[in-house]
Amino acid sequence: MSEPKPTQPIKEIDEETKRKNEEKKKAKEAEKAEKLAKMKEKEAKQAAAKEKELQNKLKKEQEKKEKEAEEKEKQEAEEKIVREHIEKILKTPKGEKKDVSSLLSSYHPTAVESIWYDYWLDNGYFSPEKQMEIQPHVVKDKKFVIVIPPPNVTGSLHLGHALTNSIQDAVVRYHRMKGEVCLWVPGTDHAGIATQVVVEKKIWKENKITRHDLGREGFIKKVWEWKGEYGARIQGQLKKMGSSVDWSREVFTMDDQRSKAVNTAFIRMFNDGLIVRTTRLVNWSCALKTAISDIEVDFIDLEKHTKMSVPGHQGQYDFGVLFEFAYQVEGSGEELVVATTRIETMLADTAIAIHPDDTRYTHLHGKFAIHPLNGRKIPIITDSVLVDKDFGTGVVKITPSHDPNDYETALRHGLEFINLFTDEGLINENGGERFAGMKRFDARNAVVEALKEKNLFKGMKDNKMRLGLCSRSKDVIEPMIKPQWYVKCDDMAARAVKAVRDGDLKITPKTHEVTWYRWLEGIKDWCVSRQLWWGHRIPAYHCIIKGVKSNPYDTNQWVVGANQEEATQNAIEKFKLSSKDDILSLEQDPDVLDTWFSSGLFPFSVMGWPEQTQDMQDYYPTSLLETGSDILFFWVARMVMMGQQLTGKLPFEQVFLHAMVRDSHGRKMSKSLGNVIDPNDVIKGISLDELIAKLYEGNLDSKEIEKATSGVKSDFPTGIAECGTDAMRFALCAYTSQGRDINLDIQRVVGYRNFCNKIWNATRFAHMKLGDSFKPESFDASKLLQQSNAINLWILNAAQRAITLSEEGFKEYDFSKVTTAIYSFWLNEMCDVYLEMTKSIFSLEEDSPIKQKTKETLYTCIDIGLRLLHPFMPYLTEELYQSLPRRPEDVIPTIMLCPYPQSQSCWANSDIEEEMKQCQDIIKSIRSLRATYTIPASKKLHTYLHVKNQENLERFTKNSSFIRVLAYASELEVSISDESRPGCIVNVVNENVSTLLDVRGSVDFNLEIARLETKKQQLVKNYETLVSKTTIPSYDKVPQNIRDDNTQKIKALDEEINITNKTIESFTKLNI
């Protein structure tokens, strides 16, 4: 048993514990103090960082403010220079050239487009007489003549008109430059129904009066006032767009000479038996109380039962449904159920039709039915044309006076015609006492109720249908039987068809010929009378003679004449009267002619027809009719028919139809959508607020304004930037691709404004490099090639290609082809390549032969480029052309009369083109690498070209200076190699060439290694997929060309994988 250990005194233990606790406490306090110090240090650092960040932010904001202030100051200074420049040029005396001795530092449309139109106009350059006087290369017996599709005087021109005029002016300017004697005749159209409607809306909106309050004479006076205002506005717009029309020959379709032509045409065609008065079914607008043409009917598609409002009515009505009701067969309890979309017309039913082969109704042949609401006995007829026995009940109601199909059926069976409506669309006395005086769609509801009372209404169901609306009033079109004047079209249409089939008249695009044949071979007589006040009053007089019963529906009781006296004399001769006293009454028809009648005479009436004027002899027939494809039948066909009938000649040799302009969403332009664009707003620019304010200037109602405002805000949130006339014209022509509608995006027009700036700067560059003393030599195409260098030969080859493509495009009416060729020449070849390459040449001594040769080449290409561009951009090209020095032989005072560039076959050089293309591919490859790694152009990098053979080594070594400049390289080494280089990124141009950039110090290599690994995975995947295709058993059956192509692709992928691996290895070694 061990001895017990001596115990430590309690006091000592307590002291030790206390000491240890104190040490722990101190340690904790020290640790806490240290943490607190660290925290304070961290907070101090954070505070310092925040302070630094704040200071940096403040510094950046200050720098931004200073930069903005500097830019604003610079912009204001530039704007001041531009304002002063414009003020100076606006002082140019009318008709004199603008001073272009100093060009602004950048392109400004307003400055460029000032003065030149007055210069052209006042010097008579638009007239063929002046052209023949001063154009040295004019060919006087070769003419090019077009007439403008006359815009309606209903309002301002829109972008559709701008497209038409841009195309026409481009074509006219091209032919004028080619030395053909050019005449482009301007004019406006009175647009009967359209103009009457807008003026009626205007006087109601302003004074709450109708045309009937003013009377015919007073209202016509108001319309002439409107024509004066808007005719002048249209003329101003055409001038602003640069249209080179001969204003000395301007016409209006209701001026004295055109009115004489209309009267003469009507009288001749009446006397020839081509115009007759008869009662037929027409499109009737109850709101306007007139017949309207097919083109003035808009159709909407209804998929199912739809409630709709109708002008002049309260509430909404049922459309898109079939109403079913029953007729009772006379003398029996049998019912025949019929279905109709227009149940109100049953009040004027005069028959029920069944199919002759329908055995269900054989027993009813020759029987009658009793009208359920008026008790009238109506026949049950058999008709295999109208009735489809398998549709519905196989029974059809017949309303001859209010349905086209029923009308034709009634003519076949000799049925009674009962007119149900007044001109205003009210039910007349034929509808019965219960319904007379009702509005037609109120009658729809009332008829349903009346049938329900008799238990004869069987219900209604959804029915897909097309509903015709008046384009002017939006009222539902009512087919109505009305006495009207008609032109017999069969023979004229047959001649028009033959003209196209025989190739005497060409239609471009050719696809429209199908429409031409379909319309004209199925043509019906043309209703030419309108129940309006504004228009050419019909020169026909109803004659009531002693002893003869009056019948205004009988054509034989009508005579024609240019005035009352002539009509009286014609009546005496026609009816073999002893004197005018035998005429009890001779009253002129109050109706006016369809606008298309006078428009149909336009190509020859503008030349002075019916007189045989000098213009008729010199300029008719015209060369081309250019217009929208939507009026091929309504205008073009009628001009052809009337031209052949009245002059014995086709009015033009060729028709070119452009597509329709729509908004960027592909929607038809409509004021109520707010997407109708005024060309002036594109030319000058306009703010959003101003765009919205313009909506209130028209005749839109409050709901339409609200809808249009929403559309404007959506499409133009910041308004429309100033683009200028030239950019707008070029954009519109560039959009034209035959047969396709144009979905116009204003941003594309802005892009072409920037293109104008490129051309401006290119010409300013030429001025600086040519020098004030430069005088170009007489033009000698072959001499330019002598002792020149590759870049000069290349740009001449590019010019030759642009000329060739432009000529082809104009001949084919492929304006997109022309604009693309010109755009590519100026931007891709002149600006992006040639001008950059000439900088080193222009740094040589002044007497250097290659420098002088380059000056001549540069001048030649600028001159050619401006002439090619002139038909599309007349203002910019005139300004820059006038700023250039002249060759000794160039004495023409304006670019518009200069010769269009001629093809120079000696400049065509396929070898130099291919060589430069390969160089450009290399440049694109290098630039692509730089863009991928976000390396700015200002950062010059050592660059390598690895090639596979001696031929490529020599080719690219020879062009290395050219490549180096455009690839932003500090040095360019060309060698035969397939090795990677330290610190280099690689791009494979093709199987023969790779580009390498030394990016050490410019790129984060760790980031790039990760990117390259991802790239390699995709390359390997593509490689394995392609290889697996070649291992299938049936691969030998694959066509040889495809197998060869696969072999090349596999080889290229393998090579790119190897290069990528080497690059990853190189980057890894750098360990950066």
Swiss-Prot record:
Any single GO BP term: valyl-tRNA aminoacylation
Disordered, as annotated region: 1-79
Q: Which residues bind ATP?
A: K671
> Coiled-coil segments, which residues?
10-90, 1003-1069
- Where is this protein localized, as stated in its record? Cytoplasm
Q: What class of enzyme is it?
A: ligase
**What are the record keywords, sorted?**
Aminoacyl-tRNA synthetase, ATP-binding, Coiled coil, Cytoplasm, Ligase, Nucleotide-binding, Protein biosynthesis
Q: Where is this motif: 'HIGH' region?
A: 151-161
Question: Reaction(s) catalyzed by this protein?
Answer: tRNA(Val) + L-valine + ATP = L-valyl-tRNA(Val) + AMP + diphosphate
Q: Does the keyword Coiled coil apply?
A: yes
One GO cellular component term noted in the UniProt record for this chain? extracellular matrix
> Does Nucleus count among this protein's keywords?
no
Q: Which GO terms describe its molecular function?
A: aminoacyl-tRNA deacylase activity; ATP binding; valine-tRNA ligase activity
Q: Which Gene3D superfamilies match?
A: HUPs, Isoleucyl-tRNA Synthetase, Domain 1
* Bias (Basic and acidic residues) ranges: 16-79
Q: Which SUPFAM superfamilies match?
A: Anticodon-binding domain of a subclass of class I aminoacyl-tRNA synthetases (SSF47323), Nucleotidylyl transferase (SSF52374), ValRS/IleRS/LeuRS editing domain (SSF50677)
Principal cellular location given in the protein's record: cytoplasm
Official protein name in the record: Probable valine--tRNA ligase, cytoplasmic
Tell me what organism the protein belongs to.
Answer: Dictyostelium discoideum (Social amoeba)
